[in-house]
């Protein structure tokens, strides 16, 4: 069996929470409940009501009806105890829900016969958690002994003074001293509670650790699911309005960087010879633009420097390309025209002579592209750009088909 060394993933934690396996610091919940009860007891528990009931019964001097007598005591008990019990229940339920992240563990409610397995019971008996609980119990005994000693040193005069207290105040004084003892015990036990929570958190994550195969399998199930991929494609498509889709389809090419920026360039020499920014998107919308352009056959040029420059210098859509970027855009347009002409088998369009810094084309035809991306990297490609596959190294495509319109472009 492979060693479990990987931290549990978010999906693993969610699945475990549905089964009831969540991080539970039970002692911290108990601390909150006891502290809430101790602080609320002086205000909610009024023992003078009990004394008053005894006085009322004794003053009548008659034999009380047993039914009415029991009903009166039950009603008095509910009046005293109900607010106190409800407050303590709420104080215990809220931290438990926070620890479980408000997850309803439906599967843990089902009847499970495997819980009666004696082998599993023996494993739990000799587990790290059992050893932790044994050490914790010993620490609590020491904490209680320390609490009693400190309480006796601080409040021994008040305890012995109860013998001289008035009967009307005796119940209240007992409640006050009990609350002080409980709060002092909780204060002394606080380091043990924090240590117990830390060890419990460590054991919880240790039980849910995964091996590398489980992590890979979970990733494959979540990322490789066809329904999930289809849903993601739908989300990308929904990111684009019909207007932006039309602008992408009418663009001469899309320059990308390569996943965070997508700039559409449109040129119509009959109207104005300056290139025009038809699309300007970032992040998830940029990915959607690239996907739509590839689906429509619009060339996608992956040029980091040019995409960033146009995005920086052309701050709005439907604006002209800055004069600093016109040279780079025109190089891409000329190069795309040469590749399309080579694919058609005709002469390349009239272009200026390349400078010494530009690579020369080999026989006017680009070399074959990558089989995965259907791209080509011709020798006369402008810096930072690439083109669709233009054919074989010996010449244009034999079928004389239409030029390729999509592909990855790399600097």
UniProtKB/Swiss-Prot annotation:
Residues 341-411 are annotated as: Disordered. The keyword tRNA processing does not apply. The chain crosses the membrane at residues 28-48, 80-100, 137-157, 175-195. GO terms for biological process: protein secretion. Residues 370-404 have a biased composition (Low complexity). One of its GO terms (cellular component) is plasma membrane. Keywords: Cell membrane, Membrane, Transmembrane, Transmembrane helix, Virulence. It is found in: Cell membrane. InterPro entries: BsaZ-like, T3SS_substrate_exporter, T3SS_substrate_exporter_C. The keyword Iron does not apply. It is a multi-pass membrane protein. Part of the bsa type III secretion system, is involved in the intracellular replication of invading bacteria inside the host cell. Probably necessary for the lysis of the vacuole membrane and escape into the host cell cytoplasm. PANTHER family: FLAGELLAR BIOSYNTHETIC PROTEIN FLHB, SURFACE PRESENTATION OF ANTIGENS PROTEIN SPAS. Belongs to the type III secretion exporter family. This is Secretion apparatus protein BsaZ. It comes from Burkholderia pseudomallei (strain 1026b). The lineage of its organism: Bacteria, Pseudomonadati, Pseudomonadota, Betaproteobacteria, Burkholderiales. The gene is bsaZ.
